[in-house]
């Protein structure tokens, strides 16, 4: 699963997830899966959606993952009293704003990529839509 190799600090503040997305255009492939909602994608969810796409297109075409989980989420163990410091890092998330391109695909037909992204979207906790590259 995806996670940073090294970070400057082990733990992070919760923070807020406001604003609009950077990376809102299809850059590498012809088709993309675009986020409509804001939310958090865990490394497991990103990997699960990637597997759904690759299983459907069966080694043809190319896929780009445009999100990376770089925020650590901590949890304290069950039945532990309040206080005594921040919990341990349990998993990593990517913060998603509306408009962010999550996945891109090239080398397959539009119908196949639509169906593959539909399968991937079922694995994700946010609403998404299918987009194509804008050619000027």
UniProtKB/Swiss-Prot annotation:
GO cellular component, as recorded: cytosolic large ribosomal subunit
InterPro entries: Ribosomal_uL16, Ribosomal_uL16_bact-type, Ribosomal_uL16_CS, Ribosomal_uL16_dom, Ribosomal_uL16_sf
Keywords, comma-separated and alphabetical: Ribonucleoprotein, Ribosomal protein, RNA-binding, rRNA-binding, tRNA-binding
Single Gene Ontology BP annotation: translation
SUPFAM superfamilies the record matches: Ribosomal protein L16p/L10e (SSF54686)
GO molecular function: rRNA binding; structural constituent of ribosome; tRNA binding
Protein origin, superkingdom: Bacteria
Subunit structure: Part of the 50S ribosomal subunit.
One Pfam family cited in the UniProt record for this chain: Ribosomal_L16
Record protein name field: Large ribosomal subunit protein uL16
Family: Belongs to the universal ribosomal protein uL16 family.
Function: Binds 23S rRNA and is also seen to make contacts with the A and possibly P site tRNAs.
The organism of origin for this protein: Buchnera aphidicola subsp. Schizaphis graminum (strain Sg)
């Amino acid at each position: 699963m995806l996670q940073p190799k090294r970070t400057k600090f082990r733990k992070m503040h919760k923070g807020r997830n406001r604003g609009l997305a950077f990376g809102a255009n299809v850059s590498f492939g012809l088709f993309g899966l675009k986020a409509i909602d804001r939310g958090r994608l865990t490394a497991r969810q990103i990997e699960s959606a990637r597997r759904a796409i690759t299983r459907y297109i069966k080694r043809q075409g190319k896929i780009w993952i445009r999100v990376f989980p770089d925020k650590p989420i901590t949890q304290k163990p069950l039945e532990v009293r309040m206080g005594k410091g921040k919990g341990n890092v349990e998993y990593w998330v990517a913060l998603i704003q509306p408009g962010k391109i999550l996945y891109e695909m090239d080398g397959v037909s539009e119908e196949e990529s639509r169906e593959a992204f539909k399968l991937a979207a079922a694995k994700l906790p946010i609403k998404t839509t299918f987009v194509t590259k804008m050619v000027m």
